[in-house]
């Protein structure tokens, strides 16, 4: 069990005491994640924009992931930096921008979502000829790029009376298809 005391303490098969042998069936949490990066947020609100009643709010949120190390905690399984791997949830950059006009009788919200270009995975060895032997830790692949995406959403609310409002939301208003991603299942 690779000298790991958490594993070694989970069983005894050569006990000198009669009936002292045991196997403790339990989950072991040896995996770890280490991440670094930063978030940015800014917002501003105008009252009576352009002399109109109500308010106009803009807000932007950004995230940059510099490093996202995943370690299975098992010898023979390589530690992988998944930052920039767009098949998961860790693109290098992602942004969310929101603009809202809010009035007593209604509101309208525009939202933009964007994430940066990336790769399918950082574990791949990219090559076309003279490739090394493909392994579980470092499989070979001839193309490892995934385009980023931009999505535009719109939503709103209408106040019917003091007790009722109606809401609507359309995600991906322009029906932008996601970038194809290779799957194993």
Sequence positions of predicted segments:
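Functionally engaged cysteine thiol sites
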Residues: 1-10, 127, 131, 151, ...
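Gram-negative outer-membrane beta-barrel transporters
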Residues: 1-122
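Extracellular loop and loop/strand-boundary signature of outer-membrane beta-barrel proteins
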Residues: 24-29, 78-86, 129-133, 138-143, ...
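C-terminal beta-signal and adjacent terminal beta-strands/loops
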Residues: 66, 111-130, 157-185
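Short, glycine/acidic-rich beta->alpha junctions
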Residues: 90-91, 147-149
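Residue-level marker for the onset of beta-strands and adjacent loop->beta junctions
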Residues: 95-96, 152, 164
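Feature captures outer-membrane beta-barrel proteins of Gram-negative bacteria and organelles
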Residues: 97-99, 154-156, 185
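Outer membrane beta-barrel transmembrane domains
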Residues: 125, 133-144, 151-153, 157, ...
